[in-house]
Structures are given as structure tokens and as C-alpha cells.
Amino acid sequence: FLSLIPHAINAVSAIAKHS
């Protein structure tokens, strides 16, 4: 589960970069 946290952060970071 902990491995999923960094993955979610990476997704949010990508979305923020796209915005």
C-alpha cells in the first residue's frame, strides 16, 4: 500500500504540470 502513495503523488504532479 505504501508503494501506492508515491505513485499517487506522481500522478498529481503530472496533472499539476499539465495544468
From Swiss-Prot:
Keyword Secreted assigned: yes
Residues with PTM Serine amide: 19
Keywords recorded for this protein, A-Z: Amidation, Amphibian defense peptide, Antimicrobial, Secreted
Keyword check for Protein transport: no
Tissue specificity: Expressed by the skin glands.
Location(s) in or outside the cell: Secreted
Primary localization class, coarse: secreted
Similarity annotation: Belongs to the frog skin active peptide (FSAP) family. Phylloseptin subfamily.
The protein's name in its UniProt record: Phylloseptin-O2
